Amino acid sequence: MHRNSARIVVAGQPVNWLGANFWSRTGGPLMWRNYDPDTVRKELAVLREHGLGMTRSFFYWPDFMPEPDRIDDAMTERFADFLERHAEADMSTVPTFIVGHMSGENWDPPWRDGRDLYTDVWMVARQAWFAGEMVRRFGAHPAVCGWLVSNEMPIYSGGSAPREVIAAWAQIIRDAVRAAGGQQPFSLGDGAWGTQASSQHAGFALADAARLCDFLGPHVYPVGDDEVRQHYTAAWECELAGTFGRPVVLEEFGVSSDFVSGANAARYYRQVLHNSLLAGATGWIGWCNSDYDDLAGQDPYRHHAFELHFGLTDSHGRPKPQLTEMKAFADTLRAVDIGRCQRAPADTALVVSSYLDTSYPFTAPSDPGYIYDTLRQAYVSARLADLPVALTRESEGVGGDAMLYLVPSVKQLLAPTWHQLERLARAGATVYVSYSPGSAGWHRGPSYGHLNAMFGVEHQLRAGLVDAIEDDQVAFNFVKDFGTLAAGTRLTFRAGGNEHSRAYLPVRPDGAEVLAADGHGRPALLLRRVGAGSVVLCTYPVEHMAAATPRANPEATSAIYEALGAHAGVRKLVTADDRRVACDVLVRSDGARFAWLVSQASEPVTVKPELAPGLWLARLDGSATDGAATLDPFGVGVFRLENAPAATPSTP
């Protein structure tokens, strides 16, 4: 299956953005009142020295548009100088029009007077006029490389609105930008916050944004209870956004030094940068360029003190560890010539239930959050199993070109989808489904359409009840060889979930063969051969159990996924012998292949990757390795995959 690697195009050339969200340390959001060109020059210089080539900048709306029909010329003169400082540093910027929300506070021009930003016709016209005026003044400057409508409009607007209203608002602003001559890449700046890329209901739909925008821009600041999931959440949201075929820019990510130590901040940046690259991201804009210790008495920093310390540099311009990590990432991008690289195709598809992104009548409000968390955990397990995985949305039609379909801990799909999955299996694919009754008491149970016939079992469910998992640790004892798992193998899983979801599916085989039994001798993993392929049923919600368990990863689901991949014939160019190390491959347009090894181990680890026949592992400079790779704690290694030289025939 194709995996999205779309690139932003600027002036006819594909580009990758690496930069910082920018407020000068002279004023934060009030920088335009206290603008100092020399300070900006120094701030940009340190970013450029560390490999960053662009910024995201902001028109602070109350200052730039003090009256509904007037632009403040003093502010625009300062922004013009700001663009010159970028040109001087050989950098570019993406201005943001409606600001709006910033760093824990909403900032209104006084003339808004509570008007609705989406439905008040006069108010929408004022926004469109302002965007058009900024484009007319600055759109021809070579330092402008894109446009954003807002900063996190779902927060600034004060609530949600119907999807069609928000789409119309976005189109009006987009049309104003284009009418004013703005041909640079355009997007919304909304954070990609909506049920198509998260479990949030904000009225914004990525499908609409993809139709209107040149790229999609997730803002990701996860809070969780599992470090590995933290490291993959930004990548997961980039994958979800990428299903719409547009370039994906990780528009905001970062950490406050008040919350995270310097070493751990660097580690987090490293993981987010590399994992999101492997998830198809084409740009990375960290939050933000500087600390603001001198602004402690100024809102929003006065009441959100942690916002003082999100910087890539401290308040004196000295690089923090996360900026050093961005430089290392920039060096890697340059070494592999990232603009010419694409993700290798995938043989594995992760099925995204339409109940994540579609509102069906009389379904539980908690369903989208449950699905998001479960799918994210399944994605982590697939990555740690070294399975190149593509997402396929049920709402867009499940793609038919994968060898392995993962349907993890699922309560419900549409009835026709179950029959489609069985047809895919009959045509030669392997379809894996793990059971879940869902996490809500509403319609509790598997809505599978034809469960018994599809999986070759007879379920033993009882009216209104779930079969609770009473063991704190669930055991899978393999009674038959399956893929990479030999008979006699024992896998264990920590049980998790609530009174509804911590449940297994009692079944009797009726045509399916039992691959593994639980600790009580009940079927835990079953296989039914159908046509040229097979369906595999897991009677425990192993992905949901892990998703509901703190500090769960790495865990044994990745071993099941690895076995599924082997059973299905999934092709992998590189795989590690340690489930704490994830492998993936980028392919350059000249045929060069680059292997990424990303460690989730808290200590140094040495692995000897298993390579596809005819390949050997080389350093980026082309020199040979001994076939092994040593990674620092939570480290990343990037290598070339070279063709092994042909053997020289021996002479008689």
Predicted stretch roles:
Residues 2-208:
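Active-site mouth of glycoside hydrolases
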Residues 23-25, 60, 98-102, 150-152, ...:
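Active-site beta-loop-alpha junctions enriched in small/polar residues
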Residues 32-38, 63-73, 154-157, 192-201, ...:
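Acidic-and-aromatic substrate-binding clefts and catalytic sites of carbohydrate-active enzymes
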Residues 91, 182-184, 244-246, 426-430, ...:
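A short helix->loop->beta-strand "cap" motif at the edges of active sites that frequently abuts
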Residues 173-176, 181-185, 210-211, 215, ...:
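Catalytic-core region of carbohydrate-active enzymes that cleave or remodel glycosidic bonds
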Residues 275, 279-362, 375-388, 453-498, ...:
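Aromatic- and carboxylate-lined catalytic core of secreted/periplasmic carbohydrate-active enzymes
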Residues 368-413:
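Phosphate-binding active sites in nucleotide-utilizing proteins
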Residues 412-652:
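A conserved amphipathic helix/loop scaffold
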